[in-house]
Amino acid sequence: MFCVQCEQTIRTPAGNGCSYAQGMCGKTAETSDLQDLLIAALQGLSAWAVKAREYGIINHDVDNFAPRAFFSTLTNVNFDSPRIVGYAREAIALREALKAQCLSVDANAHCDNPMADLQLVSDDLGELQRQAAEFTPNKDKAAIGENILGLRLLCLYGLKGAAAYMEHAHVLGQYDNDIYAQYHKIMAWLGTWPADMNALLECAMEIGQMNFKVMSILDAGETTKYGHPTPTQVNVKATEGKCILISGHDLKDLYNLLEQTEGTGVNVYTHGEMLPAHGYPELRKFKHLVGNYGSGWQNQQVEFARFPGPIVMTSNCIIDPTVGSYDDRIWTRSIVGWPGVSHLEGDDFGPVIAQAQQMAGFPYSEIPHLITVGFGRQTLLGAADTLIDLVSRKKLRHIFLVGGCDGARGERNYFTDFATSVPDDCLILTLACGKYRFNKLEFGDIEGLPRLVDAGQCNDAYSAIILAVTLAEKLGCGVNDLPLSLVLSWFEQKAIVILLTLLSLGVKNIVTGPTAPGFFTPDLLAILNEKFGLRSVTTVEEDMKQLLSA
C-alpha cells in the first residue's frame, strides 16, 4: 500500500504516505492496492479512447464509465474491494469492445501504451493485490526522485478531482466531447509514467483549465434542472417527525428522494455538501425538505449515530459506520461503497423510505436556528455593482474567500479564528464544507449586504471565479489587483483540482492549509511559490495583516 492523496496521510521523517495495513481514512491496504490496479485499467481504457477518436469513434459508454470509475478511488468514497475489482473488469471489457471497434476500421490498429493490454491475473483478491504491486504510484521513486513523483501525483490527483466533477455533471445530462477527449488524453499519458518536470507542470495547468470547463457544464446542469440559487434561510435544528438524511453532492439523488418521499410523512434533511441544495428553487419547493443536520463530514460518526432515521451517501465523504453502530441504516449510492452496508443500485429509494417509516424520527421540534445559503452565480453577479459601490465609498475594504474542505486536524481551527477575525468592513465569501467551521456564527451586514456569503458547494468556486472576473472587468483591472484574498483549506482531490483551476487562470497569492499536501516536496512548494505566490498559512494575525496590506 502507498497512498498520499489526502490531508490526513501519515507523515514521518522517513517520508509521507499511508503504507501499512490500513490508511488513516480507514481504507485497507487491499482496497488501496486494488484501486491502483483499477487506475491502471482505466489508463489503458483511456489510451484506446484516444486511439478510437483518431478513427472518429466516440464510445459514449466508455466516456460515461471512465470518470465515474476513477471517482470511486477518491478519498472516502468506496472502501469495498469487490466493487473496485468489478470496475476494473468493466474497464477492461469496455476497452476490448473499443479495441474491436478500432480494428473494424483498421486491421492494424495498435495502441502504444503500457496499460493498453492489461489483463487481471485472477479472480482471487489476494492474487489481484499482488498484481497491483506493479502499479503502485511510488514504484520507481528511487529512479525518478521525489519531485517527479510529487508532480505525477499532483496531476493524477488533480485529474481525479476533475473526474468527480465530470460525473456530477454527467448525471445531470451534461456532456462535452472536447472535455472527454482531453480527459482521456491526460489519463492515458499518465499511464506512461512520465518523468519530464516541465511536461508534468504543463499537464497540471492543463488539468486546471479543463476543470474550469467541467465546472461550467456542471453549473449549467444544476441551474438548468433546478433553477438558479437565491438566498434562502435554512433551519439547522430538528423538526418533529420521521426523517431521512442525505449527504454528498448529487442534487439529482436529492430531487428523486424528495419526489418519492412527498406525501409519506417523512422529512428530509441535508448534510455536508448538500446544504447549498436549499437555495435551488426546484428543490426547496418541497416543503418536507425541512433543514440541514450536523456539521463537517469528519463528525459523522457521532452525528449519524444520533440521527433517528436512515442516511443516504451519494458521494464523498463516508467513514466507518460501524464505529457509531449505524451501519444497518446507512445506504450508499452510485460509486460510494462500504463493506456490508446496503447499496442502492438505481434511483428507487423505496427501501430507505420504508426504513424511515419504521423508525421513531425526532420526537419534538427544536427552537429553529436559521442560516442563509443560496448566493449562486446569478445572485453574486447581481450584487457586483453594489460591491463596487461599497468599495468606492470605502464601506467595503476587502473580500476574503475562506472555504474549501474540512477535516479533523486541530490546526483547522485556524479557519474559524480567521473568519471571526475578519474586520467589520470586510466580507467573507465561503464555499464547500470548510464553511462548517463558522457558518452558524453571526457576522452581521454592511449596509444590508450580509458579511458572510455562502456561494455553495466546492464546485461553485466557478461562481466565485466568474464574480472575480466580472468585478475586475468593471473596475478595469486584473483579478489579482482586486481587494480579494483567497484563504483555502484542502483535504482531498477535489480541492487539489480547484487549486489547479485557480492557478491555471493566473490567480496568485493564494494562502492554503492547514498543511501542504504530503506529495508536495520543498522544491515543488518553492516552484509554486515563485510562479504563483502560493504559500501556506502561518498565524491568523500575520496572515490577516499581510493580506490586508497587499
Swiss-Prot record:
Cofactor(s) required for function per UniProt: [2Fe-2S] cluster; hybrid [4Fe-2O-2S] cluster
Cofactor detail note: Binds 1 [2Fe-2S] cluster.
Chain positions recorded as [2Fe-2S] cluster binding sites: C3, C6, C18, C25
Classification via CDD domains: HCP
Catalytic reactions of this protein: A + NH4(+) + H2O = hydroxylamine + AH2 + H(+)
Primary subcellular site in the record, as a coarse category: cytoplasm
EC identifiers of the protein: 1.7.99.1
GO cellular component, one term: cytoplasm
Domain of life: Bacteria
Annotated binding of hybrid [4Fe-2O-2S] cluster, by residue: H249, E273, C317, C405, C433, C458, E492, K494
Enzyme class, UniProt record, top EC level: oxidoreductase
Record InterPro entries: HCP/CODH, Hydroxylam_reduct, Prismane-like_a/b-sand, Prismane-like_sf, Prismane_a-bundle
Keyword Lipoprotein in annotation: no
GO biological process: response to hydrogen peroxide
Cellular localization per UniProt: Cytoplasm
MF GO annotations: 2 iron, 2 sulfur cluster binding; hydroxylamine reductase activity; metal ion binding; peroxidase activity
PANTHER family with a match to the protein in the record: HYDROXYLAMINE REDUCTASE
Protein's job: Catalyzes the reduction of hydroxylamine to form NH(3) and H(2)O.
Family, similarity comment: Belongs to the HCP family.
Protein name: Hydroxylamine reductase
Gene: hcp
